[in-house]
């Protein structure tokens, strides 16, 4: 039975279901998901931007 998992070419970044990349011929790999963390590293900056935009809109 054929495994139907998305694969990614490490050379050109193309996603496919094939073992070999149809674009460049490189062997594809199953990409790992990004690390998950409950700690929001960029939340502080998002909140600062949100406040700055809110204050800018009030000034107009």
Curated annotation (Swiss-Prot):
Record protein name field: Ribosome biogenesis protein Nop10
Pfam families attached to this UniProt entry: Nop10p
Domain of life per record: Archaea
Entry GO terms, CC: ribonucleoprotein complex
InterPro entries hit by this protein: H/ACA_rnp_Nop10 (IPR007264), H/ACA_rnp_Nop10_sf (IPR036756), Nop10_arc-typ (IPR023532)
Record-annotated disulphide pairs: none
Function noted in UniProt: Involved in ribosome biogenesis; more specifically in 18S rRNA pseudouridylation and in cleavage of pre-rRNA.
Keyword Oxidoreductase: no
MF annotations from Gene Ontology: snoRNA binding
Family: Belongs to the NOP10 family.
Keyword Metal-binding: no
GO biological process, one term: rRNA processing
Keyword set, alphabetical order: Ribonucleoprotein, Ribosome biogenesis, rRNA processing
């Amino acid at each position: 039975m054929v495994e139907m998992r998305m694969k990614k070419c490490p050379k050109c970044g193309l996603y496919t279901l094939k073992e070999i990349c149809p674009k460049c011929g490189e062997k594809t790999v199953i990409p790992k998901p990004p690390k998950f963390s409950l700690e929001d590293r960029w939340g502080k900056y998002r909140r600062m931007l949100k406040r700055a935009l809110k204050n800018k809109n009030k000034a107009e």
